[in-house]
């Protein structure tokens, strides 16, 4: 497992009985996590000091219980030096905060790969969410095309770019259905040296298009292969779906990309270290093809 263990403004303090206790800057949040199936005793005294707790509803969704007044949003930083990003945190109605902290281990990998390339790199970030990967790539010098189906989420990404001092970088922010966008890019003859995709398990595009990961992921990977440049640098696929193992994702990349480009593939879980126990909570998986 590859842990995201370089954070200073984020910390997974403890995890048990279906919940995480997290520190986001100076704010303590409790959020549900279906991966946390163990019911060990709470190891941190800070559970009782949580500033807000998210409660799931039996009807789906849920709501926040605020135990003290919190700002609507606040900022945290990730990375150091030229890789430092400033990201806006805001608790949403679906338990999320605008940042998936485990992805920081991938952001650092993308940035390192781009800096070492020694040539101009164009990156396509599909299902780009609030832009952590986009900004990591842009800070490393890449030209980035960021695509997400949610107008509000793309606006959040632009705000993160401004907060990180990257608003003037070569980033295209697009609200679009990812599969339809890739098909249009193929017709236009546009290509990319790096592709990142972080698809949801289930979702709908801006035109009501239905996305189900297991049904759609192979076709999308195959489409994306056709918009890679003649000398691509990397292709990364992230998944939070327990039914889609890292090895399955790697197999799709291996059989789709290696016959044309050579290179190598790898896969692993990513996770967050738990301060109270020294363990690591799994938070999804990443499969990578690289030159």
Question: Where does each model-flagged region fall?
Answer:
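Non-catalytic substrate-recognition/targeting regions of SAM-dependent transferases
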Residues: 8-22, 29-101, 108
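Conserved alpha-helix/loop element of class I SAM-dependent methyltransferases that forms part
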Residues: 101-119
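Conserved class I S-adenosyl-L-methionine
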Residues: 118-129
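Short beta->alpha hinge that forms the Motif I/post-I loop of the SAM-binding pocket
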Residues: 128, 148-152, 216
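Conserved SAM-binding loop of SAM-dependent methyltransferases across substrates and taxa
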Residues: 130-144
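S-adenosyl-L-methionine
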Residues: 150-196
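A short glycine-rich, Lys/Arg-flanked "PGG" loop and its adjoining helix->strand segment in the class I
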Residues: 215-230
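C-terminal catalytic and target-recognition region of SAM-dependent MTase-like enzymes
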Residues: 232-291
